[in-house]
Design a protein with these regions (language model features):
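Membrane-embedded alpha-helical segments of transport systems
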Residues: 148-151, 178, 252-262
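Short helical (or helix-break) motifs at transmembrane helix termini and adjacent helical loops
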Residues: 146-157, 222-234
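Membrane-embedded alpha-helical bundles of polytopic integral membrane proteins
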Residues: 1-216
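Hydrophobic alpha-helical transmembrane segments of integral membrane proteins
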Residues: 116, 242, 259-260
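Hydrophobic transmembrane alpha-helical segments of multi-pass transport and channel proteins
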Residues: 216-224, 251-259
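Conserved small/polar residues in nucleotide/adenosyl-binding loops
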Residues: 267-274
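Interfacial loop-to-transmembrane junctions
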Residues: 236-256
Length: 278
């Protein structure tokens, strides 16, 4: 428990530093997390199989991640980002065809899924930080995901009676899930209220309800991401995706809920480039 607490605090410090600085610092951290997360997923889904070194399909994935992030760093164009995604998937298919029958079709699909699921979706953390007032907005992603995790755990411990997913995740309860969403929404409201009272940004009285809405919706999706990641682990009989974060497991173990929350939060916030428009 102590190890988990210490590593959790260190992780928050690193994230706070990266989020506050933004730019190349957050870019580098997000790229690193994406590369490690992709590696964990392809190992978990047997893309690498018995090979001790990365497979050809996996190497294409790494190159694709770097290319995709370079595009995201240099331009806001979704067209070029989509092109990087398409070329990466096509590259994986090319390796599959040229080396047939070295790889199975399932491995190619798993690699493509791993590329889209972790690196691409996580990039929306960096993109959210780049929005107007992004230094404040980006934390909504974590209030929705990790805030939900914490509240769901606390409520589940106190009131949990009805299983949410008995086979997939026996410890999760419906009461905990509801408490997680409500707690995340409350955190979002308090965060908006705190910003307003501190006078750090121009947020209207009406706009203050946008934060809890984003956090609440994000919390629902974060639990879906958590359960989906658990399903992948159970399908492949593994306990943790990795050991990078002591007491927590790997990147995918800690960021499974963030992955699906980030793009949804960004999509809403992108339509409102200033907080006063929310």
């Amino acid at each position: 428990m102590l190890t988990r607490l210490i590593s959790g605090i260190l992780l928050l410090i690193i994230l706070a530093f990266a989020m506050s600085n933004g730019g190349i610092v957050l870019y580098a951290l997000t790229l690193f997390i994406s590369l490690v997360g992709f590696s964990e997923l392809v190992k978990a889904t047997n893309v690498r199989k018995e090979e001790k070194k990365p497979s050809g399909i996996e190497i294409v994935g790494y190159l694709g991640i770097v290319a995709y992030y370079i595009v995201r760093y240099l331009t806001d164009s979704d067209t070029y980002a989509l092109l990087a995604i398409i070329l990466t998937i096509m590259g994986m298919m090319l390796v599959y065809v040229l080396t047939f029958p070295k790889y199975h079709a399932q491995q190619v699909m798993s690699a493509g899924f791993s590329f889209l699921y972790c690196p691409v979706l996580l990039s929306y953390i960096y993109m959210t930080r780049n929005l107007t007032q992004g230094i404040f907005l980006v934390w909504l992603i974590f209030s929705a995901s990790w805030g939900c995790d914490t509240c769901a755990y606390a409520v589940g411990k106190l009131l949990g009676k009805h299983k949410l997913a008995p086979v997939l995740s026996p410890k999760k309860s419906i009461e905990g899930a509801v408490g997680g969403v409500a707690g995340a929404a409350l955190i979002g409201f308090l965060y908006a209220w705190g910003l307003q009272k501190a006078g750090v940004t121009a947020i209207s009285d009406d706009a203050i309800w946008a934060f809890p809405l984003i956090s609440g919706v994000g919390a629902v999706l974060s639990q879906l991401g958590d359960l989906a990641a658990s399903g992948i682990k159970r399908d492949h009989n593994i306990k943790d995706y990795g050991r990078l974060i002591p007491g927590h497991g790997g990147i995918m173990d800690r960021f499974d809920s963030v992955i699906v929350t980030a793009p949804v939060s960004y999509t809403h916030l992108r339509a409102h480039e200033t907080l006063s428009d929310l």
